[in-house]
Structure formats: structure tokens, C-alpha cells
């Protein structure tokens, strides 16, 4: 869900004085400046970086690339505003300690009550050093901070000495990571020039923080453990007063120890890693250090980690393990593996397979027990690395469970509903096990917008993947009675227009008792009927277009599933919905839409069916939009100043119309916010941090794990991979994002909007929220990928691979079993009806045999098979029909694919 236009306008008054105009910063001026800026700064130049520290605090005031000094990794434009107590800067420290044996903790922060530090003499590689006692409020320990260089790289070190006569336990030790992710009042151009995104690998001694520029180009800044600084936990710094919003996610800190927090603020929540503490005896000293290095590019992060002597892990396909589809894990480090521990015990099985020519250790990881699982690898030098998996059901079972839950638990059948929402698949609260039939934000209960439409969208998209006659019968009722005619106008001036919500708040016009007294309706989101009936929000149109399109596919490709209307009728409605979006919602239609790829799929089907007049009109409207994007440096706006969902459509149309430069810009921008990290929650997880506010139950600004952006951004990533099958990185992040749509589905089929990353929660959100937009991404994009990697050998993503006598066999494990890509031949096979069981490939002859599923679950009379144009393959013994299909009768069990002469 997005902001209303009135609030949007407040956000996009882009000007250099924007910060000063913010009421918060005006108010903060009344607070005393405690960070002395007047005393100046010290400047330093390293091999690749230039940086400055304030003389008064020795905190970082600038961090720049040596060859690009216009860009600063720090929030430099806010330095003057943030020169007050409680504002964190890079170089600060948070400590929570207690005398050994005491039960209560005491917290000390160098930012809380800012005082000038005591500079000390430098020696050797030490660039600046200070005693932090004045700014740590009478802490009983001595804390010395130093900035150092190590072979041209920057090191931040804290040396802590127990100067008392009693032992002290350090229960939390955090180093704030203050980089410039604040986009307040910035245009898209200035944000991409100035700002960064950062994501953690919470992997203990192998952990790191990656800091990428928004445009995805140039080097990636990595923060690494240098000494005694394992990445144990990642805490949001909500005590920093900088206001969090749709343009500022907030800052976080790198936690080396976290025991005190797990006993207090995070009590009862199972953390990613086991919490630790450190006891310092009287007179004992311990040093903690982080190092900042540059990887040449995002794709070269792992290469740089190896150069820096860090343990590196690569999962293939990743860290979500379906129970029917074991994964491979490749590990490389200078030291031998001493042991691998699994928690919970037995949750996964780990089997060593050998090593590669490049000395990567290879393992097979099999998922046994549903839920989170952690591997802790201990190396011979006692360094530890944690790798975070989640074991899930098979893709087929998850999607089956999802469809059942949506069309049963979420099925809303109430003929007396005054808002006309019955029958439908409605928003659901998993914590109360109830339908969300009213809410202070109208769209939650209104069957439109993302949080309202997502559930019925997921239910309909599920039928594209796994058609189920009983579910389809219910959804046909919804489409005929509720969607087409209520959510979407089917006649009159607004014909084909899509409303913002069927639910609205007008107590004077409806019977007493319609609205609950326990809900606060004094909010901007409690829309009136007029507001709810508005058809000017373009983002509501792709949901409806996708529903019409799926019904077209079901009516066209299956003989008995959908017969109420002709396939032509459904395709016409899908086409008209795309036209209506541009004509009735032109303001927001200028932006890329979430699920906007649906209009390309509709266009291709119009062409396939010979409906050339409609195809020409739709293509013309879409080209006008793409031409507009071509004129922009970064066409990634939306209702928000910056967004991560329009890139899906921007990329596909730019690619379609041959705007290759804009497609490349879009792809690089996606890679900036979709990380490849050995953690199921972050790997492939597209950045989003505000939709818990507009589509969640626990509403707060927070990095969301596998929000719908994961699977939507996977569409361009995997499309780009099929164009460039040597780019293994694209496959890794694209497949991980695709699987993100299944990551958070519960064992009984409930699908939340996203997973909460806050260490105080680490759980699914309580309602369905925006989930369906992500499942759309899985439905249209999921596939099996087969590659021969130059280092790791033959691999299958969403498939079980075996090799016999040089021949390859892959059993297909996606939910649809309808798409497979053989990278070596750039062979892309898709089925619009029917299912694949396996693919067999002989590299010597290049022949490919497809075994077709004999299962009746596909409900298809014929297998409708397509082969991508780039491979040069054809189906032996069959010719394409007018629609481009190889039509294979259902009784045929296998077909042979051969290269065309």
C-alpha cells in the first residue's frame, strides 16, 4: 500500500532546503549542539578511500571514494542537524555491562551524552586514537578507540580494559553502522547519486555488511570482522532521533555480543545466532576491530571476501530448502573445517561430497524438519561461520496448501455484506483466525489496493500453476459477481475502471452496528465512499488484469475448467483493463507498476491469438510509457519518492522495445537492493521497509524479509539470466527472489505479507497483507534451471539432478512443473498446459528428452509446449500450430528435442 496523494506531495518537495523545512529538524534546532563541529576535522587518504574525522569526537564526518569525491558514504548533508545528543555517527559504540554475578545490566553509549574525547598519541599504523571516557558517562571500563590502516584499508578498533578490581561481563557490544540511506527530500537523480543501501550477513566471524550505491554501479563497501568482531546480531537503532519514514529506513548496529538484549528487549525471541557475552577480569584487555574494504563491484563481493581471507559460502540454489529438493553448499577458506553443527538437531542433514578444482568444499544439505535451521561451521583456527537455512515443504505442496487456505479459511461468503464483498477471498488475520472485514485503513478490508486484493489475486494466480476445479469454481463466482461489476466497473462512464476499495467509512449512511466501536476511524485511511470509489490509482489495475488473464488461459487451454464465458471474452477484458489503466489513471500510470509485466503477457497473447488491432493499441500505449522512462535517468518512482516494485515493468518494456541502456540501468539498480547472502531471509530479498505500515498488522518502518518485491524483481533478474546464461550471479539472486514468495508460507498454507526482521520479533506478520503480488511473481516466473558451472559442475535450481555416463537427468520440482531452462543450450521450454516430469540431456549429441507427467492433476487434454527462439531446438515429429505451440496428446509420455538443421 502507498501514500495518498496529499501525503505524497509533502514528500516530494525536492529542494536543498528540504531538511530545514522538516518540522522535526526545526524543532531539533532548540536542542544544544554537543558535537563540536567548529573545532574542525582531520583528513586522511588511503589507497582507495578518503575520510575525515571530527577533532572533537573522532567520529567519521566523511567517507569518500578516492576517485569520486562528490559521493559520500556518510549522511553528510545532515551532519549539522545531527550534531546533538543521541544521534549516532560511525565511530560510536554501545556497551551494556554488569559486574559478574549481578542480575541487572547498565548501558553506556558514546552518543547519549556527547562530550569531547581525549586524543592520545598515535604510533605505527594508527591514524587517530582517543580515550572515550568523557563521552561514556563514567563507565567503569576503559575504552580506547583507534582509526588505523591495514594494507591501505581502514580499520575501526575499540580496545576495552577492565581497570576495576572486579570482573565485568559485557552483555552487549554494538558498533553503529551509519551510512547514508536517508533519502528525505531527494529526487530520484540525487538519491541515486548520494545514497546507499546496506544489508547484513549475520554470519559470526564470516559475517559482513555490504553497502551498495543505489544505482548498483561501482564498488561495494564491505564492513568485515578484523578481530574479535563476529557479526552476532543486527539491531535497529530506534533510539537515534532521525525520523524514520518511507524515505529513511533507519540505522542499525553491528552487534558483537547480544546476551543482555536477549534477556531484556528481545526476551523470548529465538535469534539468528546464539547470544554471547564476554567477561573481563580485573586488568584484562580485549580488542574488537572492524575493517572497511572495497569490492570492485557487487558481483565481486565474494571474490573480495576471499582476497581478505574471509570464509565464503555459496548455496546452490540458496538457503530455502524444499523437503523434496536438497541443496548444495560450497565453502572456501584458508583453514580446514573442524566440525559442522546443526541447530535444531536433525533439522537438516549435511553430507560432504568432496572438493572442486578450485578447492571449494562441496556439501549436500537435505531438509528434514520444517522451519529455521542453522549450520555453524567451526574452522581449525576456531573461527566460526553461521549459515541460515529454512526448510520448507516441496514447492508443489506449499502451493497446494496455499490454494486450500485461500479458498477455504479466507473464503468470505456473506450475502448480506453491505459493501458487496461477497463472495470473495478476503484479507485474513492469522493471529485471531478471522477475516478482516473492517479496518481503519479501508483498503485492508476493501478487496482492492495491494493489501485488499492480494489474497484473491494469489488464489487466482495459484490456478495458473496448479488448477483445481473446486477452487476455480469458487473463484469464478468471485470474478463474475464481485470483481467484474463491483471492484471493476463493467458499464457506464467508468467502464473497466478499478476502484480503490469496496469497504468505506460512512457511519451516517449505513445501519447502526456496521462499524466496530473498538476501531479508531479518525484516520486518513478511513476513506469515504467517494474516496474509495475513485478509479485513479493505476496500481489497482494489474491485479484485475491478471485475474482476467488467468481465466483466459484456463478457458483457452483446458476444456472443462472455465466455460461460463469464452476465452475471447476474458482476454478482451484483460486488454481493456490495461487500456483503462492508462486512460483513467494517467498520473500513476506514468510509473512502473507492481505486476506490470502482466500487460506484456496480455500483449503477447493478443498477438498469438491474431487480435492485432487490440495488440497494436496496447503496444502503443505501453510504448508511450516506455519512451517516457527512456528520458529519465532512474525511472523508479511511484507513489513513493523511491520504490522497488516498478523496476519489474520498466525492465521488461525497455527490453521489449530495445531500450537496452535503460534495461541495463534498471537491472543494476535491482542488484543494488537484492543481495546474495548466506541467509534465507535476506538472500534474494528485495528491499522494502514501509509496507508493514500500509499492509501489515504490526505496523512499523522495518526491513521486510521477502515482501512481494522479492518475487517481482526476480522476473527481470531471471529474464536477464536467460539472455546471459553465463551470469551465475543473476541466477542466484533471481531464483532466491522467486523462492521468496514461498519462504514465509506456514505449514497450513497461510501467507503473510512479509517476515519481521527486527530481533525483537523475527516472525511472520499477522495478516495476509500484500502477499499476493509476490505470488504473482512466482506463478508467472517460476522454473527449473540447469547449468554447468565452470567451478561447481552440474547444478539444478528447483530440480533434482543426477549424472550417469555423462548424461544429465533432472526431475522437475517447481509447483507448476511447466518451465525449464537448460543454460548450456539457452533452451527455454514452457508449457501452457500439461506438466513436465523430467528433462534428460546428452551433452555429446545435444539431444534433450522431456518426460511428460501422466498425472491427471494437470486437467489438460493436450500438452501445449513452447520452445524459446534462441536455442534452435524443435520437437521431433511435431510441428508448431498457429499459436506457436507444439501440441502433444496427453497419452504421449515423452518427446525428443533436437537441434534444427
How would you describe each model-predicted region?
Residues 21, 133-143, 149-207, 383, ...:
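Acidic (Asp/Glu-rich), glycine- and aromatic
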Residues 402, 406-711, 716:
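Catalytic cores of extracellular degradative/oxidative enzymes
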Residues 278-296, 892-897:
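Short Pro-Gly-centered flexible turn/kink motifs
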Residues 22-133, 144, 181-261:
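Acidic-aromatic substrate-binding/catalytic surfaces of carbohydrate-active enzymes
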Residues 183-187, 304-325, 385-427:
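Low-complexity, Pro/Ser/Thr- and charge-rich linker/hinge segments at domain boundaries
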Residues 334-401:
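Extended acidic/polar, glycine-enriched regions
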Residues 299-321, 620-624, 628, 647, ...:
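Terminal, non-catalytic domain-edge segments
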